[in-house]
From Swiss-Prot:
Superkingdom as given in the UniProt entry: Eukaryota
Entry keyword set: Coiled coil, Plant defense
The species this protein was found in: Arabidopsis thaliana
One Pfam family cited in the UniProt record for this chain: LSU
Name of protein: Protein RESPONSE TO LOW SULFUR 2
Stated induction or repression of this protein's expression: By stressful environmental conditions such as salt stress, AgNO(3), and sulfur deficiency. Induced during oxidative stress. Accumulates at the beginning of an extended night, which may indicate that it is induced by carbon starvation and in response to sugar. Induced by a combination of light and plastid signaling.
UniProt note: phenotype after gene disruption: Enhanced tolerance to osmotic stress. Increased susceptibility to pathogens such as P.syringae and H.arabidopsidis.
Residue stretches in coiled coil: 15-63
GO BP terms: cellular oxidant detoxification; cellular response to sulfur starvation; chloroplast organization; defense response to bacterium; defense response to oomycetes; positive regulation of DNA-templated transcription; regulation of defense response; regulation of response to osmotic stress
Length: 94
């Protein structure tokens, strides 16, 4: 009974150790799940922000293109006016 009793004691202590380690691992898994959920939420927020920024960038690009076209038209108009005024002043000179 001596050896058998020792074996049961060792087995019981091993079971206790395994239960303790299992509990630690379960806590670690729960912590990892929480961290993963937080990272997922942060990723979602970042993706939504990226979508908003892309949308804003597209709007700004369209606006800048419109402004560039307006400025180009204005420059052409002013060049034509300058040319016309130069021609008028040259023909008006004696």
């Amino acid at each position: 009974m001596g050896k058998g009793g020792n074996y049961v004691t060792v087995a019981a202590s091993e079971v206790d150790e395994l239960r303790r380690k299992n509990g630690e691992m379960e806590k670690a898994v729960e912590e990892m799940k929480k961290e993963m959920l937080q990272l997922w939420r942060r990723t979602q927020v970042a993706e939504e922000a990226e979508e908003r920024l892309c949308s804003q960038l597209a709007e700004l690009e369209a606006e800048s293109l419109d402004q560039a076209r307006d400025y180009h038209s204005r420059i052409i108009f002013l060049m034509n006016e300058l040319s016309r005024l130069s021609s008028d002043s040259a023909s008006a000179s004696p």
